[in-house]
């Protein structure tokens, strides 16, 4: 809100789809856990499900409308405009790669860059995702941080119109309307940091989407992307001051 970024935040519902109701019933325990925490969903099947998203093949499927979701319409624009807001507040953005962090008396004192430059510091915030583990070692902190890689394809001229994200529970991926078109995303790849992308993973998702959800998908080609997200064994985020 402070950055005053317009039309970036969408409050919507999510359509969960299962190929068969039996698959949903087998997954009922997880839905009950959600309900216990105040996360509500409306069950749909037959004609009631068919009228929710006209471009989605719902024949024989079982669905749920999950309420209270929010999503970003363009994460890239969000990041760019947050960076602009940071500079308006007086911040400086250095386009440089950090090689190491120098510390003294167990406190960080200097950031060194791969080009030989360095910057003395009084305080340091490390928000480097999966790469944070490498930097934290320089100041004597070790956390069991692992990288998980996900893939997506953005299709600009898909011929598919969605009013909400569609999470295909039976296929393990999500289809989201974004400013750039239709985004088909999912999978978890366990691999080292900075792996060689295996974009066949993204292609498989698009093929599944066309075969199982979107018979009218005009194109299976689009811009492909791999993203790395940090993962802790207890799945909880690591946020707060260092000890």
Predicted segments with their positions:
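Conserved beta-strand segments of alpha/beta enzyme cores
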Residues: 40-42, 92, 110, 142, ...
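Active-site substrate-recognition segment that forms the wall
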Residues: 1, 8, 100-103, 107-108, ...
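Hydrophobic pocket-lining residues that define ligand/cofactor binding sites across diverse proteins
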Residues: 86
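A conserved short coil-to-beta-strand element within the FAD-binding core of flavoproteins
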Residues: 43-53, 71, 92-109
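Short, conserved active-site loop motifs that form the nucleotide-linked donor/cofactor pocket
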Residues: 90-91, 182
């Amino acid at each position: 809100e402070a950055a005053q970024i317009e039309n970036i935040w969408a409050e919507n519902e999510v359509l969960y789809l299962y190929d068969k109701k039996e698959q949903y019933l087998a997954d009922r325990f997880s839905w009950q856990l959600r309900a216990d925490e105040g996360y509500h969903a409306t069950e749909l099947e037959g004609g009631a499900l068919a009228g929710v998203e006209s471009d989605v093949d719902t024949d024989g499927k079982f669905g749920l409308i999950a309420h209270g979701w929010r999503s970003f319409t363009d994460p890239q624009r969000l990041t760019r405009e947050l960076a602009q807001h940071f500079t308006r507040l007086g911040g400086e953005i250095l386009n440089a790669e950090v090689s190491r962090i120098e510390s003294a008396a167990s406190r960080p004192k200097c950031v060194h860059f791969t080009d030989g430059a360095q910057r003395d510091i009084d305080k340091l915030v490390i928000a480097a995702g999966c790469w944070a583990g490498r930097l934290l070692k320089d100041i004597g902190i070790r956390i069991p941080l692992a990288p998980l890689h996900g893939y997506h394809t953005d299709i600009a001229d898909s011929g598919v119109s969605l009013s909400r994200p569609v999470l295909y529970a039976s296929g393990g991926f999500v289809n989201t309307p974004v400013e750039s078109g239709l985004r088909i995303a999912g999978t978890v790849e366990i691999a080292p940091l900075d792996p060689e992308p295996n974009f066949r993973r993204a292609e498989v998702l698009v093929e599944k989407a066309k075969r199982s959800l979107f018979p009218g998908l005009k194109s299976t080609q689009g811009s492909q992307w791999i993203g790395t997200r940090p993962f802790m064994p207890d799945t909880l985020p690591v946020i707060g001051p260092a000890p």
